[in-house]
């Protein structure tokens, strides 16, 4: 990759690395407007990362997509985003604009109670294994709202379409079709 530092700006182009047992690639532009305010815009791709490590690595994901903590497995994660930063370089969530894509196969739902209730209601063939065959999700964040675009999730013999909106205050409106 390439790194440029000039005029209170840092530009990282096509940096690749291996960390957290995953391959990563990023491009980033940071501008320090003042000692208390900054801007960052970036594109970040992570391949085959453990979901738990992803949420630990990017804690803001837990605010934006709290459902991620309910799964175990490997996913590919892509995000393009821009945001204002505070004096500690933390993302100012209200200014965040982002597009996220998460794709994973053979993911396990960790919340056993939720799975047991679903398995009973939907009469799953396999009531013990809470494996999702595949998930591919597209999400945007803008004006304090998270929009989850309709996506298909496969579990047991069912295929469900899920989509909706979630506000950063954790209120939500989702639609599920089976």
Task: Specify the residue positions occupied by each region the protein language model found.
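Extended serine/threonine-enriched, polar tracts that run as long, contiguous segments within proteins
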Residues: 141-148, 152-169
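Membrane-proximal interfacial segments on either side of biological membranes
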Residues: 1-132, 158, 163-178
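Generic long, charged, amphipathic alpha-helical segments
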Residues: 127-144
């Amino acid at each position: 990759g390439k790194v440029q530092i000039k005029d209170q700006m840092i530009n990282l182009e096509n940096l690749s690395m291996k960390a957290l047992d995953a391959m990563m690639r990023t491009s980033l532009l940071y501008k320090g407007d003042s000692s208390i305010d900054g801007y960052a815009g970036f594109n970040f791709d992570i391949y085959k990362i453990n979901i738990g490590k992803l949420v630990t690595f990017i804690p803001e994901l837990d605010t934006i997509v709290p459902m991620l903590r309910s799964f175990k497995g490997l996913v590919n994660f892509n995000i393009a985003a821009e945001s204002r930063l505070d004096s500690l370089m933390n993302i100012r969530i209200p200014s965040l604009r982002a597009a996220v894509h998460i794709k994973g196969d053979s993911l396990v739902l960790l919340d056993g109670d939720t799975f047991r209730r679903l398995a009973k209601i939907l009469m799953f063939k396999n009531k013990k294994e809470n494996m999702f065959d595949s998930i591919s999700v597209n999400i945007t964040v803008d004006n304090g709202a998270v929009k989850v675009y309709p996506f298909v999730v496969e579990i047991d013999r069912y295929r469900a379409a899920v989509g909706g909106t979630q506000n950063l205050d954790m209120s939500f409106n989702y639609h599920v079709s089976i």
